[in-house]
Amino acid sequence: MKIFKKIASQISFFTIIPSTKATLEEVASASFISPIIIGVITALIDYSVVFVTSKFLGNLAFLLLLPTVEIIRGFHHLDGLLDFGDALMAKDYNKKIKALHDVEVGAGGIGLLLVYVSIFLTVLLSIKTLSFYSLLIAEVESRALGILLLAIMPPIEISYMGKIFHKNLNNKWKILSIIVEVVLFGNPYILISFAILLLFFYFLGYSTLKGSSGDFIGAIITLSFPIFLLIAERSCYLFFTSLFSLI
């Protein structure tokens, strides 16, 4: 029963959906399976909202995906994006660390928010269809990217959450499990993009914070979601076209 409690706790921790309460240690110990669990649930909600509203709004319903995604997450990852944006713009290391705990949003946070919204809206306005499969890929891969970086990157000294998650995830079998999730929900285009983003954010985290933190991981999940969504929509057509052309 304890394992089911840990699995259910992923839902209440990563979304606003009420579920079993658990300690941070319990959540972290089972978080390696959260990309699939949370990814499937949130993709179903994302698609349901867009599908129902598209009956009245047509393709304009795609724009509702942005607020839907953030509401389901409880704006927690978005808060991390704002904090990391401020840290990114701070000049010295101590100011970068301080920015992660500053309740006020600075120019860096607003700037990174505009980048995120611009990317998301550009993606939504550029696609002609929005499939459940693409949403599932984006949800799973963006979360797997964040969780994998928590597992392989040492946390910064002041990040309590980062320390707990890293301690519970830095295990070869759990890391392998996350990689399996990435492969299962990816095609060649997605996997190449995942590897590029993994390297980019890994070096960005080290150059900016000298490690990982909850805010940094929240920023990664937030920024990578629309990127994976676009690649999924574009690559699904290319992948299956090339696959059937070989048969």
Curated annotation (Swiss-Prot):
E.C. number: 2.7.8.26
Protein's GO biological process: cobalamin biosynthetic process
Transmembrane spans: 32-52, 105-125, 145-165, 183-203, 212-232
Reactions it catalyzes: alpha-ribazole + adenosylcob(III)inamide-GDP = adenosylcob(III)alamin + GMP + H(+); alpha-ribazole 5'-phosphate + adenosylcob(III)inamide-GDP = adenosylcob(III)alamin 5'-phosphate + GMP + H(+)
Cofactor(s) listed in the protein's UniProt record: Mg(2+)
Keywords of the record: Cell membrane, Cobalamin biosynthesis, Magnesium, Membrane, Transferase, Transmembrane, Transmembrane helix
Location within or outside the cell: Cell membrane
Membrane association type: Multi-pass membrane protein
Record's keyword annotation contains Magnesium: yes
A GO term, aspect molecular function: cobalamin 5'-phosphate synthase activity
Pathway the protein takes part in: Cofactor biosynthesis; adenosylcobalamin biosynthesis; adenosylcobalamin from cob(II)yrinate a,c-diamide: step 7/7
Cellular component, GO, one term: plasma membrane
Function as written in the Swiss-Prot or TrEMBL entry: Joins adenosylcobinamide-GDP and alpha-ribazole to generate adenosylcobalamin (Ado-cobalamin). Also synthesizes adenosylcobalamin 5'-phosphate from adenosylcobinamide-GDP and alpha-ribazole 5'-phosphate.
Listed HAMAP family: CobS (MF_00719)
Stated family: Belongs to the CobS family.
Descriptive protein name: Adenosylcobinamide-GDP ribazoletransferase
Source organism of the structure: Sulfurisphaera tokodaii (strain DSM 16993 / JCM 10545 / NBRC 100140 / 7)
